[in-house]
Amino acid sequence: MSMRKIYLISDTHFNHANIIKYCNRPFSNVEEMNKTLIKNWNNVVRDKDIVYFLGDLILSKNKAKKARELLELLNGEIVFIRGNHDKFGEKFRVIEYNGYKFMLIHNPDSSYTLNFDGWIIHGHHHANHLDEYPFINPKRKSINVSVEVINYKPVSLDLIVKLIEKGKVVRTINDL
């Protein structure tokens, strides 16, 4: 039987029209963006997999209802870390995987990260500050899983571990 995989993703901003322009997303409208994000997610994640969602799921009226409807459409067991646009989820979580310690948090500049000695996996910065917050930053020990950086689909923790072991900066997943 195949193992459950662990995936990470942040900042989908479902239903948020302005994010398309603000973050230069390759979609012509919200419907196309929502459909593509759902399809990409479900092409990668199986029902038994775990997805750590690091904040900013959806921006819309009737947010709670819309979020519930949206979650029905997404594969996997989803663990929420609260983003700056969310009212639910843990503030952060620390996990160990393959001998590494990871803090999962929305904003890497949060005071929670100050004395943490492992790797910080975060969102929040989208692809707006890639020099400081690229996909993989060995110097800062940070990993940016905002959708714009990981090509709009969840990224596996196995791939992240492989990349941090190489010790090189990776600006976006498209640079691999």
Curated annotation (Swiss-Prot):
GO molecular function terms listed in the Swiss-Prot or TrEMBL record: hydrolase activity
Top-level division of the source organism's lineage: Archaea
CDD domains: MPP_AQ1575 (cd07390)
Record Pfam families: Metallophos
Protein's UniProt name: Uncharacterized protein MJ1445
UniProt lineage: Archaea, Methanobacteriati, Methanobacteriota, Methanomada group, Methanococci
